[in-house]
Amino acid sequence: MFDSIIFDLDGTLWDSTVPICESWNVVLKRHAEIKRPPVTINELGECMGLPMYDIAAKLFPLESKEVQTAIMDELCAYENEYLSEHGARLFDGLENVLSLLSKKYRLFIVSNCQDGYIEAFLKAHRLAKYFDDTECWGRTRTCKGESNKILIKRNNLCNPVYAGDTSGDAESADYAGIPFIYAAYGFGNVSSDKY
């Protein structure tokens, strides 16, 4: 029996593609030197779940690594501020589900996002009361599976399960040696029948 649930964030708890797209395009308007059209929701959807600098390489392939890193850092900083104020679309019934689950399980979030992104989600929607801890790529600079391991060890979890919506989420659970629950309503696909 599980004693805790570790959630992915994007595509599992909320869909933030529209406000992220809005915030990124505000920043990109300040940078005429970046030669690309505005970021689209479809482009952003294809990037969900990737580490931040992999997204930068995908969206800004003509720019140097240094420029990719600098622009992504600026995009993420403004994104955190924007999401903290405006929030995003929570999946139907999320707070009710979290309230029910938190009565039986300890709840956590592990995401490939920048530092401050999970906090923006929690602040905008007043959901911090349901989660014991969080971890992200922005703090660990490691793969999601390793971030899962760090959170599991730090919280002395014995039987956690990871819930996510992409094959990368499934792989991160496998890497951490924990079961995976597939959130089929999310952004991605998981090809294995074992979920």
Predicted region positions:
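N-terminal helical cap/lid subdomain that shapes the substrate entry/recognition surface
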Residues: 2-92
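Short, acidic loop-to-helix structural element flanking the phosphoryl-transfer center
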Residues: 81-109, 115, 119, 145
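A short, structured active-site edge motif that brings together acidic residues
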Residues: 44, 127-142
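Conserved Lys-Pro-Asp/Glu-containing loop-to-beta segment of HAD-superfamily phosphomonoesterases
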Residues: 4, 144-170
